[in-house]
Amino acid sequence: MDIDNFKSVNDTLGHAGGDEALKLLADTMRLVFGTHVLMARFGGDEFVLCIQNRDQEGVQAQLDKLVRSMCQTFTYGGCSVPLSISLGAVYMTEKFPYEKLFKEADSVLYEVKTRGKNSFEIWKI
């Protein structure tokens, strides 16, 4: 998952504003998922969510809520920018190495961003 057009957020609001946008995302993820998910910043504006033992429909509803919650105008220091996220997810039916999961999730994320961002998609592997 990453913040759409994060470079323009940083360019407009400065790095302190970008940091606040990242904090908003982390806080929103906590509200949506609670303690039932492992969340980690993967680098820059990219995050990884690891959700175990959940039904696909429930996860889909939570991801939809997260994407909708993050689609907003974000204001920092008197300046405002549009904010949204794109998310690629994989739903595994058997065990895979983490490297494969990350690679597949990154491929899904690329597809979402190619189609226009501010969305999510889940691939079953």
Language model features with spans:
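Active-site flanking residues adjacent to catalytic metal/cofactor-binding acidic residues
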Residues: 1
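Conserved long alpha-helical elements within nucleotide-processing catalytic cores of c-di-GMP signaling
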Residues: 4-34, 40-44, 48-49, 56-64, ...
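Structural signal for conserved beta-strand scaffold positions within catalytic alpha/beta enzyme cores
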Residues: 41, 89, 121-124
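Catalytic core regions of nucleotide second-messenger enzymes
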Residues: 41, 70-86, 113
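Short hydrophobic/aromatic beta-strand micro-patches
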Residues: 50-52, 90
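Catalytic-core segments of nucleotide cyclases and related cyclic-nucleotide turnover enzymes
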Residues: 60, 64, 77, 91-121
